[in-house]
């Protein structure tokens, strides 16, 4: 983690429970990020917070540290039953819930607290067996949590800490009724520690906070900067017929270590995957139709470096927390301004540098003024030489519905795509030496 991303506040200097301090030290956490430095002193006084911070700022560890510390420092409720967790962490997507659980387990290893995770798309009975053994901290998506609550498998009567992560996405995905349903089944707000985090603290998010929290303290990290200074943004104005050639040329010349390509529709994503796969790239496809087990497998392949490029829609990519993404390509400009911020926020995390490349084509160019107004700056324009675009592109492959859109054994081709089994750090250089960016 880059030191430029950290504050001068040390975890060791905070009044944390000894077991939490030990867990942080053994996992290499010495200095707080800005959101941690601002939120933890408030939370350690048992005050609620509504925090605004961009993704990749360390907010997950902020609320996990506060949750573990609160449970370790607070007496267990009298007559607490085995099916009553003491803390609940709600996330908008399965992938985000899984990532939070992985981080929570790092802290749980040094405490007696048990962590459980529930989400849709996986075995109901397997997750229930974990709950039947009792958990202290329940992490999950609202739909599956509600299923277990309604069946009496879990009770929220002993909740002492609540986390609502990515609250703005909860609204986008229509989960607010579910959240209110769960809040109504917990002890009163003044009997628990409440934490809400969101990339944006819109009026509807603030209303939710004040309805279900106890006079929360508002914590903001650089709210005037909606995009990170670590991200180099640029935009092209390609014709519709040039778009795919331009994308393949940029990827060929940038040769990103790990890239996500966003498009606005499932059909467009499938088309992009076909072209990239045909060009020999190790590419995965994430749309709303991809089953959960396949999603997890594709994400693992991408995270572990077996895939270099991920093509995704906004809905399919929500909640993804993947480190070391070097490039984001907006093949289509999003219709929602906030989606632009969420998309490019997947690179340039934790103090690292990132690159965001956007296309303003005939169909979506009208979205640009609203996006630039929302982020409070103009995106630098880059031009390209049409004659310098790749002209030896292999045809797209057909999508085989019975096979995962993940890593496959790719055929070797002379002068096209990556050789089979090669990695970005050791693969071939771009097949053409050309300059596609012009002043």
From Swiss-Prot:
Pfam families per the UniProt record, alphabetical: DEAD (PF00270), Helicase_C (PF00271)
Major enzyme class: hydrolase
Helicase ATP-binding domain: residues covered: 40-219
Motif DEAD box per UniProt: ranges: 165-168
Sequence ranges of Basic residues compositional bias: 425-439
One Gene Ontology term from the biological process aspect of the record: RNA catabolic process
Protein function: DEAD-box RNA helicase involved in RNA degradation. Has RNA-dependent ATPase activity and unwinds double-stranded RNA.
Protein name: ATP-dependent RNA helicase RhlB
Provenance organism: Shewanella sp. (strain MR-4)
């Amino acid at each position: 983690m880059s030191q430029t991303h950290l504050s001068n506040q040390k975890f060791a200097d905070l009044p944390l429970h000894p077991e939490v301090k030990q867990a942080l030290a053994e996992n290499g956490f010495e200095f707080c990020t800005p959101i941690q430095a601002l939120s933890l002193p408030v939370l350690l006084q048992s005050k609620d917070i509504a925090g605004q911070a961009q993704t990749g700022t360390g907010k997950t560890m902020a609320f996990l540290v506060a949750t573990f510390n609160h449970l370790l420092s607070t007496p267990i409720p009298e007559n607490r039953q085995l099916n009553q967790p003491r803390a609940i962490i709600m996330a908008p997507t399965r992938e985000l819930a899984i990532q939070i659980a992985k981080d929570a387990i790092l802290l749980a290893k040094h405490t007696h607290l048990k962590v459980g995770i529930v989400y849709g798309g996986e075995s109901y009975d397997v997750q229930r067996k974990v709950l039947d053994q009792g958990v202290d901290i329940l992490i999950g998506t609202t739909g599956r949590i509600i299923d277990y609550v309604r069946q009496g498998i879990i009770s929220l009567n002993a909740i002492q800490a609540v986390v609502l992560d990515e609250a703005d996405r909860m609204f986008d995905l229509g989960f607010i009724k579910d959240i209110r349903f769960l809040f109504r089944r917990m002890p009163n707000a003044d009997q628990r520690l409440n934490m809400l985090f969101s990339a944006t603290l819109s009026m509807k998010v603030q209303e939710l906070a004040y309805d279900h929290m106890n006079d929360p303290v508002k914590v903001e990290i650089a709210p005037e900067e909606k995009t990170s200074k670590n991200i180099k943004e640029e935009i092209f104005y390609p014709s519709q017929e040039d778009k795919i050639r331009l994308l393949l040329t940029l990827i060929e010349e940038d040769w990103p270590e790990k890239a996500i390509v966003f498009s606005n529709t499932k059909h467009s994503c499938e088309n992009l995957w076909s072209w990239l796969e045909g060009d020999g790239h190790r590419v995965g496809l994430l749309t709303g139709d991809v089953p959960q087990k396949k999603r997890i497998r594709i994400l693992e392949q991408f995270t572990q470096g077996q895939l270099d490029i991920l093509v995704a829609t906004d809905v399919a990519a929500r909640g993804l927390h993947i480190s070391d993404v070097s490039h984001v390509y907006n093949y289509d400009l999003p219709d929602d301004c906030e989606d632009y911020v969420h998309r490019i926020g997947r690179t340039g995390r934790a103090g690292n540098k990132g690159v965001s490349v956007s296309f303003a084509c005939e169909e979506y160019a009208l979205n640009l003024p609203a996006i630039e107004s929302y982020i409070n700056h103009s995106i630098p324009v880059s031009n390209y030489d049409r004659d310098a675009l790749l002209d030896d592109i292999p045809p797209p492959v057909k999508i085989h519905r019975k096979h995962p859109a993940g890593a496959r054994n790719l055929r070797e081709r002379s002068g096209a795509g990556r050789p089979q089994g090669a990695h970005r750090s050791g693969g071939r250089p771009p097949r053409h030496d050309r300059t596609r960016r012009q002043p």
